[in-house]
Amino acid sequence: MQGSTDSQSRISSVLPGAASCRNQCFTYYIKGTERTVNHLCLSSILIREGLLIMENTRFAGILGTGHYAPEKILTNADLEKMVDTSDEWIRTRTGIETRHIAAQSENTSDLCVHAAKQAMEAAGVTADDIDFILVATASPDYVVPSTACLVQDKLGCTHAGAMDISAGCSGYIYAVAVASNMVKAGMYKHILVIGAEILSRLVNWHDRSTCILFGDGAGAAVIGETEEGYGLLASDLGSDGSLGKILDIPASGVAEPVTHRAIDSGRIYIHMEGPEVFKAAVRHMGATTLKTLEKAGVEKDDIDMFIAHQANNRIIQAIAKRLQVPADHMWVNVDRFGNTSAASVGIALDEAVRAGKVKHGDIVVLTGFGAGLTWGCDVMRWM
């Protein structure tokens, strides 16, 4: 640490008690409120306040966002004609009214490209500036090659590395964390992150428990270096493979290949044990968010924009209630998009940004939960 003596006096003046640690806890003040944190959080607070400067420290975060939704819209009224359901039943239980459905001519990589171009334009970068591409998806164009490689070709990012991330609905959260830390480590300057899905081809349109939920779309972001103290402040990624069977596609790989029997029995489609998924989602999204806020040295009251995975409205509201996030500090679009899995947080974030709801210096919290089971949270100070 540079200028340790001078920094010590500055720390003491701004963070009373930080100079004399007792029981590995520090007391500091923000907006006139006394707060106490453990020693693991102190570095995040000092960096954020501009009091701690490490040699070769890089800061990284989102420079621009974009999203894309296919033109076709499927309404609840349309679904009433397909399965035994009703608009009232769907809205009451999920909050969903419409969802976008990809055309037969569109693949996941195509949705990625549309969203990526928006994000690159917003970030002021070109295809030549992109050093690496991360695509989070559960509905890739192929098993191999990766969807990220197809996107690399379609965008003309000729010197970029590329790979897919398979973390279900948590994929965008995972990708933002991985990309930000790759930039912080000095590996790359600009990384394109995309969460994209065409789940309409993976649901059984005769199963009303799943076909009413999912939609297609893509959300993208360009990750790069930010000003000191801005960008990703902290992240947390978790998983529990022992519960993987409550949300899966049984016949989708070498453990259970696609056969005529698997097709006839419906095992090639999304299978979900709704009540168990609901309980796990609320528990883990709440816990990972609180853990990440602590890592970042940020209180719940400091949150300016909270975006949770848009699974269904009941889950979103349960998370918000647990975290005591007011409605005007949230962005919810599940009513218009349905559950777009890895795309949902990216789509919601871009909408919030373009609506002017996310401003320079705002604390933005992204949290998600998905198949795996996986979960995660990113806390950032917006550029």
Predicted regions and their residues:
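Short, Lys/Arg-enriched N-terminal segments with co-localized hydrophobic residues
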Residues: K31-I53
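Condensing-enzyme catalytic core mediating Claisen C-C bond formation in acyl metabolism
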Residues: I53-Q104, D207-K279, R283, A287, ...
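Acidic, glycine-rich active-site loops and adjacent beta-strand->loop/helix elements
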Residues: H67-Y68, A136-D141, A167-S170, G195-S200, ...
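Conserved catalytic cysteine-centered active-site region
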Residues: W89-D110, T137-I191, K321-L349
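Phosphate/pyrophosphate-binding loops at sites that engage ATP/ADP/AMP, CoA/4′-phosphopantetheine
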Residues: A115-D131, T288-D302, A352-K357
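Flexible, glycine-rich active-site loops centered on histidine and acidic residues
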Residues: K184-A218
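Catalytic phosphate/nucleotide-handling subdomain of diverse soluble enzymes
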Residues: I347-T367, L373, V379-M383
